[in-house]
Structures are given as C-alpha cells and as structure tokens.
Amino acid sequence: GTTVGKWESTVTDNFFPYVQTSETGNHVGVRYVALTDETGFGLMAAATETMEFSALHYTAEELDRAVHPYELQAEADTTLRLNAIQLGVGGDDGWTRLVTHEQYRPHAPVYRYGFILGAITSDDDATALARSWQTSVAAK
C-alpha cells in the first residue's frame, strides 16, 4: 500500500511544456477531483473505485496538432478527461514513437469503471461529499 494524499493545483500548472507537445498532466489512482473557480463553485467527479484524470486548457486534439508548446493557445475553458486507464505516450521520452515498456501496458481485455459527477460549492467538504457519493453507489 501507499499513503493517500490530498493535492491542490491549478489547471494551468497541470500542463508541462515538453519540447515536442504531447499529452501531459495525467493523475492516476484518484478517488475524486474537484474543479472550482475562485468562489469555490465547480464540478466534482468521484470514482466508484479509482480513476485517472487530466484537466487542461487544451483538448487532446489541440495537443496532437501542435508540434511545440508555443503553437498552443490556452483557452479559458477547462477540458476534463476521466479515464479508467491509459497506455501513455510510450517509450522513455515523449518525442519518439517507441513502444511502451511491457510492465506499463494495460493487459485486461475489458476495463470498467464508474464515477459520479456533481456540483460542488465552497460550503462543501469535497472529501466527505466524495465518500457519501461512493457509499450511495456501493449500496445499490
């Protein structure tokens, strides 16, 4: 096992400007993610088990089209991606098309995961809210 942590960041800080643009900012083993504005109002996703997520000011298509970070224009909108698992970009770096190492490849033929989406406000305790959502799903 490992220690569970609670982390805070900004959408802007989730982007890393690799020399050659690629997907970035993916978080794994996540129980919930809350995206809020400066007033604390926003959207929360709570996984029924765990999930992966990224939150960026760019879509996957925009990242794929750009060769270098300076070609990207950050949008005010946030693109939230929720995944069960990703293969990743592969290899030992982000700029060559090497195959992902065997130990990092997903092997199950089918993956299933669930999550609950809902609003969150500054009055909510995100951890307690996520637990209550997860408990209500588990009871069904």
Task: Indicate residue ranges for each PLM-predicted region.
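Beta-strand/loop-rich accessory regions of lumenal/periplasmic or secreted enzymes
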Residues: 1-140
